[in-house]
Regions:
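Glycan-processing catalytic domains of CAZymes
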Residues: 2-295
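Carbohydrate-active catalytic/glycan-binding domains of CAZyme proteins
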Residues: 296-395
Length: 395
């Protein structure tokens, strides 16, 4: 993580495991190693409780567990444990699995008990909620008290794993933008989730039909840049080491001795650390150490992103007050006759160099004195100098 610039990790503790002696012993051993090396390599670490399978009444088990951890690892003394993650001036604890409508035994009452208990112990809280938490539909229960619980917390993190693929993602980028607006209005911080792909193959066998392709990192990068463009100030990457669901980003062998079992490896053509590098680069952009990038890897065989059906000559690009890049292209689309007979201007714009808006034609050669009867214009840069304010206003 230090090598690739990943800021830190959330260490999951499952209530269903720590309720028994063997599970508690295992998770304590893993946490002890993680705490030790988080400080050694100066990576942030935060305890995260997964409530899946929790029974009503086990809220106190969680509160007792975190109190013991806080004392054992000096979570409330930043000088003694500088790597433990703080938020709003307090050590952070994450509680995942609140508000889902999948018939869980616990509900908002138990979640409220946990949140209030953590707050009373001096922690800040990040709450893991369903995708449709804001609209209270889809994967989310319809009880508006969920919003009250979210407002009690310091950060919320909606669960997106399995909800979309690279083709359907744009709708969810819009959802993230609207989520962030709600969060700012209600003074709660927001951590959108991204994931590299998905497969049940390693857990349930190769014939299982639940699969979301990674597209050699393009899917992950699209989400990372989408979250940053939407205004995210923090991002939760799911997951570092989740092999069962095919979401791991850590180094992974492509060929392993599996016998009759199934193993879904990384794609051919990518290095084992490819996803670590992508997340590390996104972290630099999120921290504003470098500018936003528009592609995980430039494909020189890809078609022109916005002009595939016309001849253009000497297009000019400008960034106006709205922060978008506008491309003004002279062309001869109706009908196409050649590059020396450009008879109209077309405008395209973008804010990310990936998604382009076609604003259409803004004028033709017969509308201006410098146009020729047979078609054709003077140089575009001269036209823009004379008419840019008018053109910009009309878009």
């Amino acid at each position: 993580m230090q090598e690739y610039g990943l800021d830190g990790v959330f260490m999951q503790r499952f209530i269903t495991e720590i309720r028994n002696e063997s599970g508690l012993k295992h998770f304590n051993k893993v946490l002890n190693s993680a705490m030790k090396f988080a400080n050694k390599y100066e990576r942030a670490i935060c305890v995260m409780y997964d409530l899946s399978g929790m029974q009503p009444g086990e809220e106190q088990l969680l509160l007792k567990d975190i109190a013991e951890i806080a004392e054992r690892y000096s979570l409330k003394d930043h000088a003694k444990n500088p790597s433990y993650l703080y938020h709003n001036g307090k050590p952070l604890v994450t509680v995942w699995g609140v508000g889902f409508n999948d018939n869980r035994r616990y509900g908002l009452k138990e979640a409220a008990h946990i949140i209030d208990g953590l707050k009373s112990q001096g922690f800040s809280v990040m709450l893991g909620v369903p995708t449709q938490w804001r609209t209270l539909n889809g994967d989310t229960e319809s009880d508006p008290r969920l919003h009250e619980l979210i407002r009690k917390c310091d950060i919320m993190m909606p669960w997106f794993v399995g909800r979309y693929n690279e083709t359907t993602y744009p709708k969810y980028q819009k959802l993230v933008e609207e989520d962030i607006q709600w969060a700012k209005k209600n003074q709660v911080d927001y951590a959108p989730l991204v994931f590299p792909g998905f497969s049940w193959g390693n857990l349930k066998g190769k014939d299982h039909n639940s699969f979301i392709p990674r597209n050699k990192g393009s899917f992950l990068w699209t989400q990372l840049m989408g979250a940053i463009r939407a205004g995210a100030e923090m991002i939760y990457v799911a997951m570092f080491d989740e092999i069962d669901e095919g979401t791991a980003i850590f180094k992974c062998a492509k060929k392993v001795p599996v016998g009759k079992s199934t193993f879904v490896p990384l794609e051919e053509g990518v290095e084992s650390d490819h996803y670590l590098k992508l997340v590390g680069e996104a972290a630099k952009i999120l921290r504003k150490e470098k500018a936003v990038a528009f592609s995980a890897k430039l494909d020189t065989k890809s078609p022109n992103p916005f002009i595939r059906h016309m001849y253009t000559a000497d297009p000019s690009a400008h960034v106006w007050e709205d922060g978008r890049l506008y491309v003004y292209a002279s062309h001869d689309i109706a009908p196409p006759r050649g590059c020396d007979l450009m008879d109209r201007y077309h405008v395209f714009s973008t804010d990310d160099m990936i998604n382009w808006t076609d604003h259409g034609e803004i004028l033709s050669s017969d509308q201006v004195p410098w146009g020729r009867k047979e078609g054709g214009f003077m140089w575009l840069r001269i036209v823009l100098t004379e008419t840019a304010p008018t053109i910009s206003t009309s878009l």
